[in-house]
């Protein structure tokens, strides 16, 4: 009876295990199949298989390599396991052990095969996570830039060294484990042998000697790679990054001593083991190797060198190495071609307003995107389930001229549905998409109602900015899957057009054309209601990965994404543009930084970055197009070779979309964060850090009355810069101040068109307006303080605060005008009630020490000009002409 119970229990356990295994296989196969269908829906089926093959060919190839090393060595060792066969006839206890040993003889598959597989997988495991880097190892070309320390191509260190370090470390583990296990096999066999007092077989000794040589060679190779790792030393931070005098003049020679002494010592030791000669040389090499290793580990000598050589003469001793770091960092962050224009600001009181300024008033953005979010939501949300996730800035051709605008996509937000309406049918079949966008001019007046250039669900536009297909199925909201078209008759719910969910004509989903597909999709989504729903037709498609960031990361996880995706409204459809970056953390001698990109769960560390790709996502069908805008990026060149057909040239981009390209926000912020220190290209100046910059800061008044200092973020501005006559330039502007100070030092302009490329929609170049120290130039914080001290403005602010309204001052916009700067700051008021709709109340202008406030830009500019003229007459000051008198200076 007991046997039957044990048998039934064993059978039940086996059935449960098999059922669990079968379930895991079904789930894995379903996930694989559905993901393949999804890639096929994007016309990326070949790309899907290519990534799949790369991953498993590289991972499998490495595993097979280590498997062969283990198995062939175990097999070879088994040939020398020579237990006396006569002993097996004996019935003694000892013969049992010898019979057990017999299993390891003659390359027995039951032992060596599973053991080799287990060890190979264990050793190759790190490669499974680095297969993407392995692609660059094989496909990335030379960088075409020589690193300054060893004179090698930077691409060798960027793409080859990281994989070689991984190979060396795992090969050393493999060789060491193999040598120990083979030696143990030989020892056990020899101890059980009747002739255990005899010397080991010659073949066994040769085998072990070869394994020892392998360990020594791989270890020596590790020392060679340690030489390259010196390029990433951070011991001299925060002064500079990379190797210094101690690393290159002390540690590097010791590394070579370790390499030579190890190789020669091992060869001498093996020679002594075979011929009993060379012991003295082997011991000498061992002593030298131990001494060199000890000198590298012990900090006494480096500390003495640092104390008595480096610190007394830091610039002289480290000058060469500081220069290496500066040059490498500027190259790695694409900062080595920045143009700097030195400007001496107009003396105080001599400023004049250029007549051309009035022509550009319509492009001065007095509405901050962060305040427009509430305005759009309250006035254009229209339905409770619509929301505006982000407000973007762009420029469009309106009535024959370029106008800067704010715009936002009206997306579906299922979290705003009433709790009782959040059922399966509503979420997946009815409320499936957003609808349209809103566009407002960036320049508005406080004495007029909000002006709209695209509004309402009927896509009304008085300036021709409407679109034929405004449905937004793919956006920034984290949406669940949707099934369209379906049998539900949607009227005035998810869009303005009736029956939109019945007539979906896009190709951005996985077709549900059979019962099997419906079953597999139900398993994939863990949702049985999809299988049993009667509202799904044979033409229905499953739309998923609908968040555009998730969508892009699913296809190309090797690209970093800008935190500011933006929409483009064309006459046909609405599109999203996402700036993508290639990053690496292995550019030699380049300073590292950390940054959190869109979609990242944590900050990533890198010391090389390029904005090489612009990704266009169709908001209607979710199609993805990758356009190359930097053909010189070696990282992207590697991916282009690895994935032919995925990337296309920017010239293939539709003109209306290409016209909306711009200098990306995150890239500019990263570059300026690094350039704030690394613009000091002279090692002496760099060491002193006397001219380090910082992002300008300004005081912001919170709703509770407190004032906090916040960094002035880069902002987009449409203007006309010198070099391209009559060309409106959409640029990023970022004011920089000396570190610890508030006066303006530099006005950085990202995306300034070069004179030789005026016809391009945007430029990748950066221009710096660097202001002389001879004349004080106020920074945003100082201008804000002047506004606070203006009695007339303070009086009006106090009156508003007493009327149950909350007053907020927006960001300070800096407009360069010749040798002067015009500061613009909008003033908003909003009710303290639960419904908050900010209103533009006033516009403040400041130039020099004059501050004025009016209801519109034009009125404020007139008042400012009157005050300037009056001041100059009163003081007898001769006004300075705003027309440029040196290269690069410009009227706006």
Curated annotation (Swiss-Prot):
One of its GO terms (cellular component) is extracellular region. Keywords: Cell membrane, Membrane, Transmembrane, Transmembrane helix. It is a multi-pass membrane protein. InterPro entries: UPF0182 (IPR005372). It is found in: Cell membrane. Pfam families: UPF0182. It comes from the Bacteria. The chain crosses the membrane at residues 7-27, 57-77, 107-127, 163-183, 206-226, 252-272, 281-301. Belongs to the UPF0182 family. HAMAP family: UPF0182. This is UPF0182 protein MCA2716. It comes from Methylococcus capsulatus (strain ATCC 33009 / NCIMB 11132 / Bath).
């Amino acid at each position: 009876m007991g046997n039957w119970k044990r048998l039934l229990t064993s059978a039940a356990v086996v059935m449960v295990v098999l059922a669990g295994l079968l379930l895991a296989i079904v789930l894995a196969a379903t996930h694989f199949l559905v993901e393949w269908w999804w890639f096929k829906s994007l016309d990326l089926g070949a790309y899907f298989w290519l990534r799949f093959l790369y991953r498993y060919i590289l991972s499998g190839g490495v595993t097979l390599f280590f498997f062969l090393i283990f198995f062939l060595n175990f097999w070879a060792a088994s040939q020398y396991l020579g237990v006396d066969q006569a002993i097996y006839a004996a019935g003694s206890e000892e013969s049992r052990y010898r019979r057990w040993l017999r299993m390891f003889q003659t390359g027995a598959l039951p032992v060596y095969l599973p053991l080799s597989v287990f060890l190979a997988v264990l050793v190759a495991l790190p490669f499974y996570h680095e297969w993407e880097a392995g692609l660059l190892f094989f496909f990335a070309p030379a960088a075409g830039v020589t690193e300054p320390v060893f004179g090698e191509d930077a691409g060798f260190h960027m793409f080859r060294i990281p994989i070689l370090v991984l190979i060396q470390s795992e090969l050393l583990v493999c060789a060491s484990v193999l040598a120990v296990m083979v030696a143990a096999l030989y020892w056990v066999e020899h101890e059980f042998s009747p002739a255990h007092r005899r010397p080991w077989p010659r073949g066994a000794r040769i085998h072990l000697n070869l394994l020892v040589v392998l360990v020594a060679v791989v270890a020596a190779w590790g020392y060679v790679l340690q030489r390259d790792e010196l390029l990433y030393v951070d011991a001299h931070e925060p002064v500079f990054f990379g190797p210094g005098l101690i690393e290159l003049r002390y540690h590097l020679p010791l590394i070579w001593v370790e390499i030579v002494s190890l190789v020669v010592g091992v060869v001498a030791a093996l020679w002594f083991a075979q011929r009993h000669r060379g012991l003295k040389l082997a011991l000498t090499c061992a002593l030298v190797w131990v001494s060199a290793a000890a000198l590298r580990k012990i900090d006494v000598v480096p500390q003495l060198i640092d104390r008595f050589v480096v610190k007394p003469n830091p610039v002289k001793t480290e000058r060469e190495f500081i220069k290496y770091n500066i040059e490498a960092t500027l190259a790695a962050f694409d900062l080595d071609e920045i143009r700097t224009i030195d400007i001496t600001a107009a003396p105080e009181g001599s400023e004049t307003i250029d007549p051309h300024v009035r022509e550009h008033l319509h492009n001065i953005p007095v509405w901050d995107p962060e305040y427009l979010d509430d305005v759009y939501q309250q006035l254009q949300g229209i339905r409770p389930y619509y929301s505006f996730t982000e407000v973007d800035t762009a420029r469009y051709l309106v009535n024959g001229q370029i106008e800067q605008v704010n715009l936002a996509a009206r997306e579906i937000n299922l979290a705003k549905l009433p709790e009782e309406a959040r059922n399966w049918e509503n979420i997946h079949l009815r409320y499936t998409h957003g609808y349209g966008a809103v566009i407002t001019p960036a320049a508005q007046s406080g004495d007029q109602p909000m002006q709209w250039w695209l509004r309402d669900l009927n896509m009304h536009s008085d300036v021709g900015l409407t679109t034929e297909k405004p449905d937004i199925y793919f956006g920034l909201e984290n949406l669940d899957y949707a099934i369209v078209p379906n049998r539900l008759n949607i009227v005035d719910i998810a869009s303005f057009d009736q029956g939109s969910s019945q007539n979906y004509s896009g190709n951005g989903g996985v077709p549900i054309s059979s019962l099997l597909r419906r079953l597999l999709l139900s398993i994939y989504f863990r949702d049985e209601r999809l299988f049993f729903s009667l509202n799904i037709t044979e033409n229905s498609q499953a739309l998923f990965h609908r968040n555009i960031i998730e969508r892009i990361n699913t296809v190309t996880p090797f690209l970093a994404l800008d935190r500011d995706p933006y929409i483009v409204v064309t006459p046909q459809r609405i599109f999203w543009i996402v700036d993508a970056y290639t990053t690496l953390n292995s550019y030699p001698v380049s300073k590292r930084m950390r940054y959190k990109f869109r979609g990242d769960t944590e900050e990533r560390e890198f010391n090389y970055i390029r904005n090489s790709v612009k990704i266009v996502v169709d908001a209607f069908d979710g199609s993805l197009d990758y356009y190359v805008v930097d053909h010189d990026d070696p990282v992207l060149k590697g991916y282009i070779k690895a994935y032919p057909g995925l990337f296309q040239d920017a010239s293939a981009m539709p003109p209306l979309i290409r016209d909306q390209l711009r200098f990306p926000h995150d890239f500019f912020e990263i570059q300026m964060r690094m350039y704030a220190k690394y613009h000091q290209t002279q090692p002496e100046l760099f060491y002193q850090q006397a001219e380090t910059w910082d992002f300008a800061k300004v005081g912001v008044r919170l709703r509770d009355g407190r004032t906090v200092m916040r960094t002035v973020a880069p902002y987009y501005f449409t203007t006309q810069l010198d070099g391209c006559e009559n060309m409106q330039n959409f640029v990023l502007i970022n004011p920089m101040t000396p570190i610890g100070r508030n006066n303006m030092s530099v006005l950085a302009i990202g995306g300034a068109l070069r004179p030789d490329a005026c016809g391009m929609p945007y430029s990748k170049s950066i221009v710096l307006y660097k202001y002389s120290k001879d004349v004080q130039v106020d920074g945003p914080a100082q201008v804000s303080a002047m506004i606070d001290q203006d009695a007339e403005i303070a009086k009006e602010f106090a009156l508003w605060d007493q009327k149950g309204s909350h007053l907020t001052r927006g960001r300070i916009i800096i407009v360069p005008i010749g040798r002067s700067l015009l500061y613009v700051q909008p003033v908003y008021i909003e009710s303290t009630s639960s419904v908050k709709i900010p209103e533009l109340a006033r516009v403040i202008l400041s130039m020099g020490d004059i501050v004025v406030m009016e209801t519109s830009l034009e009125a404020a500019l007139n008042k400012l000009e009157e005050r300037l003229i009056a001041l100059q007459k009163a003081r007898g000051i001769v006004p300075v002409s705003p027309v440029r008198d040196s290269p690069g200076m410009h009227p706006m």
